[in-house]
Amino acid sequence: MWGTAMDISADQAGNWAAKWEQSFNMNHDQVMEIADVINYLGNNYATTAAEIAESVNEAASMGQITGVDPKATAAIAASMQAMGVSADVTGTTVKRIYTNINKGSMATAKQQQAFARLGMTAEGVAKAMQVDGTGTMLNIFEAIGKLPGEQKLSTLNALFGQWAIEGGAKVTQNLDLLK
């Protein structure tokens, strides 16, 4: 049924549902809630439910480890895609952001400097992600957005990595779309 709503085949919908039940450790009803959120986002953002679902399939289980609910991963993916980040890049971008801001004591010196620029610490962010991953990410994007223009790109690069700059920059500059 949600295959029709997302304009994907029943086989693809069933495939994703089965994978999500396993990888997200959820039951069928919980997976259907995610599908409903994805369908809503696809209907209300400049992207499609199928593109969002593809990114969720790629990044949401990593998001769960870092403290971000799969529905929030869907919202992050939809926001990036609505701002022009291609669907095939979004999943990788989201995974890189999750990985890089959760290094804690293993963060590089440049990452630690970037967090300090934001008034944060790598260890503090990693711990905060486990309590409220989505809220912590919003705080990071908001803090980057408040930096002087000449510091934004280098901070995005240090925190998220070169391959996630585009998505991170677009979310930072259009944070209301994510909220």
Task: Label each PLM-derived region with a short phrase.
Residues M1-N44, E51-E58, D69-K179:
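Alpha-helical architecture feature
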Residues Y45-A46, G63-T66:
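Short coil/turn linkers that connect adjacent helices within long alpha-helical scaffolds
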